[in-house]
Amino acid sequence: LTSGSSAGLAPMMGGTGPADAATETYMRYLASEVGPSGVRVVGLWTAGVVETLTRAKMADVAGDGVPDPEIVIQMIANAAMLRRAPRLDDVADTAAFLASDRAAGITATIVNVTSGLVAR
């Protein structure tokens, strides 16, 4: 899982963007190494998942200026192409599909599960 911050430039993502890019590059190299053995490697972009936006988590990031999680969720929804924030079940359902035989031809890629919050 990465946040998709490797896809573009955004303030306050100077550490996350390069780390995501490195992880995504590693996944592609790993896919080329283990693919001949029939192993697939697929990553997921997740960002702004509603169930992870707790007041406690945001306090760790924002300190004393903790915004109301509902306001943050609405801001994410407004910024997303699908006009809704991604949900944990979106990520879980996508991961289950990718792990299944129905996705047998998918490897060495990142699947975007951000409701269009991140695009490349």
Go through each PLM region and give its residues.
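A general structural signal marking secondary-structure boundaries and capping sites
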Residues: A7, G65, A80, R84, ...
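Conserved SDR Rossmann-fold cofactor-binding beta-strand/turn motif
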Residues: R40-V50, A99, N112-T114
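C-terminal substrate-recognition "lid" of short-chain dehydrogenase/reductases
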Residues: R84-V113, V118-A119
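Charged catalytic carboxylate motif
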Residues: A22, L53, D90
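Catalytic loop of short-chain dehydrogenase/reductase
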Residues: L1-P36, W45-V50, N78
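A glycine/serine/threonine-rich, flexible loop-to-helix segment
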Residues: V49-A79
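Short, small/polar-rich loop/turn modules that mediate ligand/substrate recognition or access, typified
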Residues: G35, R40, I106-A108
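Conserved loop-to-helix N-cap of the C-terminal "lid" that shapes the substrate pocket in Rossmann-like
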Residues: G43, V66-I73, R84-A92
